[in-house]
């Protein structure tokens, strides 16, 4: 991707100097294509691979407007940036904080009373999530009456996370006479519909022929082998591992930690915002592993991540792109690996049809650990987490967006039970017609304890 210096862009001179001093002087392709159009007052719809510098592509024109005096000194807010996740909002505020502007962040999980107090202060940029911004704008509409710039970052996810109704209400409350930008790594019908309704003759900017920031490799493994391969390939690397559910993150982070892997961080939507902020800061500063759900898949810039592992097939195929974008950022190297169980092979072809090519990895299993080796590490606390993780995974799998492609009946349920190191199979409607060879299920009256069948209780190694 070609780059030029900031000196090639016509914008405020003092801002150029500060951009250079803050390490953004070498402009990326998306910045060079986007910034001039926004400075001319044009709306833009930008599709660019994740990790290519979209944040500065929309912040630079906003900052230039403020530095030129068009936003500074005028009453109210100059720009609003809407994001799908709290962490992305906090990161954008952090980048804006490098410059001579005041930027406030309004996100869920924080005190609304404190937000109302901050609204009484003067600031130029408001960044936040749709729900909290809707509350703020609804109470202080006048403060946003002079708005000149609006940005929807990760626009496809703003529509896909269930924010659509709140987003539409929020946009309806903001002034129409503004410059609007939609930014995302993927573009779908919902984004196009949104642009037709709220943008005026937008300039379409598409950077990069391939949405994927790195080549996607896949490894065909049984459920239990997923854990063994994970423990093998993450050794000594700075890695992010994505799971389907919060309970899986809790269980596997605890298990891998007991297996001797140091500095394991975990993030998911059920963790408090203060704790999420602390964990992000810890992982940002230290090497190690981050186990998470898709809450960490969008926009967050973790430098030096050289491997992304998709432990579970994501519900939305576009998540592959955004997850993979946590590595190979801004030209650095990285890898993205998808674990595919035998019943999920059709998913690889589905990805190819969606423009996300995947190649089978040459990796060969070489783990020295066995099922019994890892099982011996299971504590009573972890055993409790394992049942919750198993139940959440089964339900998530049955409700998968492409369940018609994933062969639920073809799942190796015995290996899946081993992956979660179950002592008994929990009673679940989703397992009513499932037969286990190595485990017995509870009787319908719930009185029968389901333990591994006798012939499988002996020590066994995973081949």
UniProtKB/Swiss-Prot annotation:
Region feature (Disordered): 444-463
Keyword check for rRNA processing: yes
Binding site for ATP: 48-55
UniProt motif (Q motif) ranges: 4-32
Cellular component terms per the entry's GO annotation: nucleolus
UniProt-listed Enzyme Commission number(s): 3.6.4.13
UniProt name for this protein: ATP-dependent rRNA helicase SPB4
